Amino acid sequence: MVKPNNVKIKNKGNLKKSNESQNDYMKGKKLETKSYQKALLSKNSNNNNDGAQAKRLKKKEEFKKKLEKRQNTIVIKDKLKEPSTFLKEDQSFFDQNIFNDQDDYKHQQMNRININENFETNLFGDMMNEFDGDLNEDLDLLDYNDEVIDNSNFDNNGDQFNSEDEEFYDDEKQAKKSNKNKNADADNKKSKKSNKKEEIESSEKFESFPMDENNEQEEETTSKKKKKTGGFQSMDLTKNLLKAILKKGFNVPTPIQRKSIPMILDGHDIVGMARTGSGKTGAFVIPMIQKLGDHSTTVGVRAVILSPTRELAIQTFKVVKDFSQGTQLRTILIVGGDSMEDQFTDLARNPDIIIATPGRLMHHLLETGMSLSKVQYIVFDEADRLFEMGFNEQLTEILSKLSENRQTLLFSATLPSLLVDFVRAGLNNPKLINLDTDTKISENLSLSFFTLRHEEKLGVLLFLLKDIIYKKPQLPTTETTTTTTTNNESNQQQQKKSSTIIFVSTKYHVEFIHILLERAGIASTYIHGYLDPVARKINLAKFRSHQVGVMVVTDLAARGIDIPLLDNVINFDFPPKEKIFIHRVGRVARAGRSGIAYSLVSPDEVPYMIDLHLYLGRKFLNKFQYEGQTINDPKYSFYGTIPQTIIDRETEFVNVQRKECIELLSLTKTIHNAHKKYLSTRPGASHESNRRAKLMDKSKYHPMLSDHLNSNDQIRNDFIQSLKSFRPPQTVLELDARKNNVQVSIMKDKRKVHTNVIESQQKKLYLQQSETNLGPENEEFDYSKLDTRKRLLQLTENITEEMLRSNKSNDNNDNNKDIKMNENDDENDDDDEEGENDDDEEEENEKDEDDEEDENKNKFNIKIESSDKNDNNKKKLKSRSSSRDPNFFISATPENLIQERAMSISNRFTKDDEVNLVADTDRKQKKSMVWDKRKGKFVSSQADADRKNSKKLVRNEAGKLVEAKKSHKGYEEWKKKTHGRIQRVGEDENSKYQPNQKEYLPQKWRGQGREKEKKDNKASHAKGSHGLKGRPSELKDKNQISKNRSEKERKMRVNKTKGNPKGSKSKSGGGGGGKGSKFGSGKSKGGKSRK
């Protein structure tokens, strides 16, 4: 084992005092002065009582005892002598034998040294703090002599001892203190010997202290528990990375981090489905830093993170900076809005990680010709938003410039079909991690559906918000003015507490409903796809801070924002797909909270509601089945109508607001047209759901409205529904009822024959309703009733066939026999129906009796059926799935297959994983889908775009399509200015090509105003330097240079005008003109001679 270096302890002041330290000497002096002053005061004050003096003396004695205790426990460094000459340099006082009596006196002081307290700098304190936690195994490198070191000094590192050991050491300390207090008044030599013996005994006890088997088992169990915790410590991360994670306060990884980080470290390509706020940023940042390690001197970017927006890129940049503390990794941010020159300098410094938006990164790749061939790790953060914002061309172009050995990670909340195609093309055998719980509705979520006409939706929406969600408290009506003010205040407070989001189909509905709610006194905000990003951010901040309780939104806008936990959701337009409904409702009833999802269902949307319940496996009722049942029952969802009086009241308010508000009046027609286009692009429901929707009873009130209804309202509704369902038996031919009318007599004879057929058909429909659990009574499906129902269906089918045959044949005798048979069968049918309506015990008895009769018939009366009944066999094949008895049937698939599939990791991307949200405008819908002649179906236009055309045109960070040509203007100017360049990939890092380190700039200096701020600061520094140094700055601004140029040009013009000859105006020649100009006149000798 390696021994520590020799520790030399010197006397700092070289004092000759052996038994007293400097601190003790100073304390003694202070005590002497205090005692002298008190003695003087006591002489002067002779009137003091004896009791006061006694108290003072007691206090003095107690204080002296405390000082003696401190002196016995604390040994100051001045007490230590200089090291003796006989000690070797390679030995320390830890290795000496203190059990020798001759060395007792020499090393008595040394044995009681507290290393961390006796010196100005802690010798081992810093080192011990570094080895906290799981790194205590490194302490084995240091070999200490256990006989000398007092183990109580290492109590700070409690992780390496058990709780029983700590109790043992505490007992030893208390024993030492008690012994020292007893021997405080004794001589110094005796006290020193006793303390030395106690220390030796404690050390011997510690050496001979055996570890019990129970303690060993406890240690094993605690170590196993630590390993099974599933924290970041079990992921084999580096020391600096683990310290940075724990420093941020992250102790336990989230589910997406727990499943994705080990797979990313293994090198798999991953598609992770998780919404914002689930910890997906840490899921790809932590393994990235683990894999990259430290800065590489060879030139080349090794990791790229692409974000859809500037704000998200800045957020990930901060996370990477926090997690990369302690490493020398170089991370840069490349987003739109910052200056290109500063980003050129960042790229020239050989960064390891680039966090960028696709538009600006593509601009740099075209400008500088930079290569990404060394990239090992690329992340597409919020991939569905990247494709929604139109970055498809940039992403495919960036992928084409990467190496094939890269690791690609893609994180998204949904998987549109366009994104699935991108995954199949760009990723290598990716693993799908789908931990999004949107595939499952919470048990605390209650579903309510209101069936109504489409024109009544606006009125019902106001009724839900005013009277159900934000219900005003009932107050006494003595003072009308006070009650109105208190109701408004309470309504606003409830809106702030509970948050509600309204989903609509188009952006025009968003604007219309927002204006209508504002005029109704309900504060709201709105977000749609065409809203400005700044306005979207402001509106979302209002909703998240609970300044506003209602937000109107479309599906696409809700996909791109981080919506907090909600209390209520209203589906104004029912979603055409089940997963879109689950996506909308996913924020409600989370984290143990309860919530309600309200849906306004028009008649054409009822089949979609049935498809949803088939997907969820829930039954839906229009009344309570038993007493005490509430709407919060997780097994059922409830539907029903709203009283017409309430609907009329609210729709009247809406009509009045349309007439008064010009904006609502102008948006009314646009809403109508937008809804028509939405219906044309909406996918259709299943045929079975359309058939079942016609059989539903949509006449009863919703069970939630029991508090808002009276008994008279229910009676009125029943009467109105009976009027609606009334169908007179007379036909058009029987309107003119006369005695000798032939038509009337024919219809009477026909009715006598076909009444039984009509009744049997009605019974058949009734049985189908009860079997599909959509009848008026909404009975639960019971497998014990299945046989009787089948018999009834077969009987009614036989009846109809026989009646039709009898009508074709005109034999009266056969008709009479058939009628008798039908009457007997009808009686049997009536008996069976009564049996169904009786109690379950009677039904079971009847079933047992019928089964016994059938068994007896099968035993003795064996018949061979003919193969003529093909129709009956076909019907039996169709209804084969409904004849399963759950007591005996064993399915090939497990019951929780859907849940396990939703929470599993797979390599396949099926249609079940895809979620294509409906666009909020017709223009987006037309752009997204194009007819493909070869495939014979509609295909996404962006996925089927030509690669050649996409390379020619690239969308820049401003959102405009620009030709993908290399323009080196900005880059060349930067190279001339800084005398640097971006090195090629694979070169060794060279500092001469890198520009000087840029100065730190705060966040407010980013963007366009940065250069202006720098110039203003330079000008202010120049003005200040003139007064200090006594001379002005020699640097000139652009304005000064242009001013000097204009002044110079003006002077040149003045000089030219002064040099023009005046004699040139005369008729004389050039020479005469010259002389004339000299003398200032046009007359000269030359001129005279020429005349």
Swiss-Prot record:
Residues 824-855 have a biased composition (Acidic residues). Keywords: ATP-binding, Helicase, Hydrolase, Nucleotide-binding, Nucleus, Ribosome biogenesis, RNA-binding, rRNA processing. A motif (Q motif) lies at residues 230-258. ATP-binding RNA helicase which may be involved in the ribosome biogenesis. This is ATP-dependent RNA helicase ddx54. Residues 1020-1029 have a biased composition (Basic residues). The Q motif is unique to and characteristic of the DEAD box family of RNA helicases and controls ATP binding and hydrolysis. GO terms for biological process: rRNA processing. Its EC number is 3.6.4.13. One of its GO terms (molecular function) is ATP binding. Residues 478-632 form the Helicase C-terminal domain. A motif (DEAD box) lies at residues 381-384. Residues 26-35, 196-207, 814-823, 865-874, 944-975, 1008-1019, 1031-1052 have a biased composition (Basic and acidic residues). It catalyses: ATP + H2O = ADP + phosphate + H(+). Belongs to the DEAD box helicase family. DDX54/DBP10 subfamily. It comes from Dictyostelium discoideum. The keyword Nucleotide-binding applies. Residues 261-433 form the Helicase ATP-binding domain. It is found in: Nucleus, Nucleolus. Residues 1-63, 150-231, 801-896, 933-1091 are annotated as: Disordered. Residues 150-161 have a biased composition (Polar residues).
